[in-house]
Amino acid sequence: MNLAVQSLAENSETGMTQLSDTVFTQHFNEPLIHQVVTAYLAKARAGTHAQKTRSEARGGGAKPFRQKGTGRARAGTIRSPLWRGGGRAFAAKPGDYSQKVNRKMYRAAMRSILSELVRQDRLRMIDKIMLSKPKTRDLAKLLKPITWRSVLIVVAEDDRNLELSARNIPTVAIRNVSRVSPVELIRFDGVLVTGDAIRCFEESLT
């Protein structure tokens, strides 16, 4: 398929480029995308939550009152889950929430996401984006014609000036094509991809 190449500096189309049908014309596989995105979000969980059971709560070794004759319900410890300050009945413990996603599933999900972004006109190809120095104002000026509320810019190589310029714009993110995740592709309203990054996608996902 063909995709227009846009110039941010001139705010116009500079030509057309041929995209790989293997990567950019796949059907929308929602169950697979859901599984991969869920795995990414699960792996991001710290899993450090911890609560104390009745045996771990400090104190409570002595029986609070005698078994019979008080009229109260019997109790053997003040750290029972029924008591204020007691341990939790089903205490949360640190755990690993990561899920396995093999390479074949990941590549298929990425192809499906990229194809759907192209169909929805949420992925646009730009010729290049370069800044001579880190300046937020310069980057904001380049992106001013873009109507998306949030923009993900995918580049082939790390650009320190570009990253520093976008750091103070909360709705803009810069990602290297090798580090972009399915979650980020879905989360942003639109994705700008350089020509070199498009070729990297085609090489890595075929």
UniProtKB/Swiss-Prot annotation:
Family matches, as SUPFAM superfamilies: Ribosomal protein L4
Keywords from the UniProt entry: Ribonucleoprotein, Ribosomal protein, RNA-binding, rRNA-binding
Chain spans, region Disordered: 48-78
An example Gene Ontology molecular-function term: rRNA binding
Gene Ontology cellular-component annotations: ribonucleoprotein complex; ribosome
Origin: domain of life: Bacteria
One of the GO biological process terms: translation
Gene3D superfamilies the record matches: 3.40.1370.10
UniProt keyword Transcription regulation, yes or no: no
Task performed by this protein: One of the primary rRNA binding proteins, this protein initially binds near the 5'-end of the 23S rRNA. It is important during the early stages of 50S assembly. It makes multiple contacts with different domains of the 23S rRNA in the assembled 50S subunit and ribosome.
PANTHER family: 50S RIBOSOMAL PROTEIN L4, LARGE RIBOSOMAL SUBUNIT PROTEIN UL4M
The family this protein is said to belong to: Belongs to the universal ribosomal protein uL4 family.
HAMAP family reported in the protein's UniProt record: Ribosomal_uL4_B (MF_01328_B)
Assembly: Part of the 50S ribosomal subunit.
Name used for this protein in its record: Large ribosomal subunit protein uL4
Organism of provenance: Nitrosococcus oceani (strain ATCC 19707 / BCRC 17464 / JCM 30415 / NCIMB 11848 / C-107)
Gene this chain is encoded by: rplD
